[in-house]
């Protein structure tokens, strides 16, 4: 399977933005890429869900249920949200859905939920999903204070499991003036032996930010 698995160091770090930007950049370059969200939970009515945003980035080439096999109401990890509804997530079903997309498209960008070790099923985490898919993992992290520890831990967890690290992207998720931002990339590189691929700037205009991310990431990340 050709593509990327996009994980984060936490929830709210910008995984969906990055995944959508990667899909758009790939499609603009002539590669038939499609996004996938294996399981989403806590969707706020009236706002586009992560899966809907990935479908839009993919030019609506697939129905929503093909892009997102599982949807839950509670804003919890997929395994916990499924339990509340008396349901269970199947790793085999998710892998089958991803392979079906890969059979119809040149590349699949799979966006996980939360961080790498967030439980996907009653027994498996998103790390297990990345391993089952055999995809390199792109780590999306906050640019500001606290990211050095979170990012180093995530990279260490990937390496201990023998998962390929496609790179690290630091994302400014707000306009706050954080003096740690200019220093964090160097610290992460020193600890992980991996220079972050990009430091994504904050941009309040959503459309402009989407174009900016696509331009930056399209030049940095190939799959």
UniProtKB/Swiss-Prot annotation:
Write out the GO cellular component annotations.
Answer: cytosol
Q: Which cofactor does it need?
A: Mg(2+)
Which NCBIfam families does the UniProt entry name for this protein? bioD
Named in its record, the pathway it takes part in is: Cofactor biosynthesis; biotin biosynthesis; biotin from 7,8-diaminononanoate: step 1/2
Q: Does the keyword Membrane apply?
A: no
Disulfide-linked positions: none
Organism from which the protein derives: Anaeromyxobacter dehalogenans (strain 2CP-1 / ATCC BAA-258)
- The protein depicted here goes by the name ATP-dependent dethiobiotin synthetase BioD
Quote the Pfam families the UniProt record gives. AAA_26
Name the enzyme's class: ligase
Active site (UniProt): 37
Q: In Gene Ontology terms, what is a biological process of this protein?
A: biotin biosynthetic process
Primary role:
Catalyzes a mechanistically unusual reaction, the ATP-dependent insertion of CO2 between the N7 and N8 nitrogen atoms of 7,8-diaminopelargonic acid (DAPA, also called 7,8-diammoniononanoate) to form a ureido ring.
């Amino acid at each position: 399977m050709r593509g990327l698995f996009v994980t984060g160091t936490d929830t709210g770090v910008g995984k969906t933005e990055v995944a959508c930007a990667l899909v758009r950049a790939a499609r603009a370059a002539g590669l038939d890429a499609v996004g996938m969200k294996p399981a989403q939970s806590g969707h706020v009515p009236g706002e586009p869900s992560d899966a809907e945003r990935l479908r839009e980035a993919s030019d609506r080439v697939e129905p929503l249920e093909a892009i997102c096999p599982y949807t839950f109401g509670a804003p919890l990890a997929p395994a916990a949200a499924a339990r509340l509804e008396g349901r269970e997530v199947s790793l085999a079903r998710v892998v089958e859905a991803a392979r079906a997309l890969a059979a119809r498209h040149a590349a699949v960008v799979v966006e996980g939920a939360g961080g790498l070790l967030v439980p996907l099923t009653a027994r498996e985490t998103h790390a297990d999903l990345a391993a089952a898919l055999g995809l390199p993992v792109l780590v999306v992290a906050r640019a500001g204070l606290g990211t050095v520890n979170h990012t180093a831990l995530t990279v260490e967890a990937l390496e201990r499991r023998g998962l390929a690290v496609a790179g690290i992207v630091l994302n400014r998720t707000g306009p706050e003036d954080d003096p740690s931002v200019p220093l964090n990339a160097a610290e992460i590189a020193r600890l992980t032996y991996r220079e972050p691929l990009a430091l994504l700037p904050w941009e309040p205009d959503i459309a402009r930010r989407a174009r900016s991310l696509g331009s930056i990431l399209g030049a940095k990340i190939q799959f």
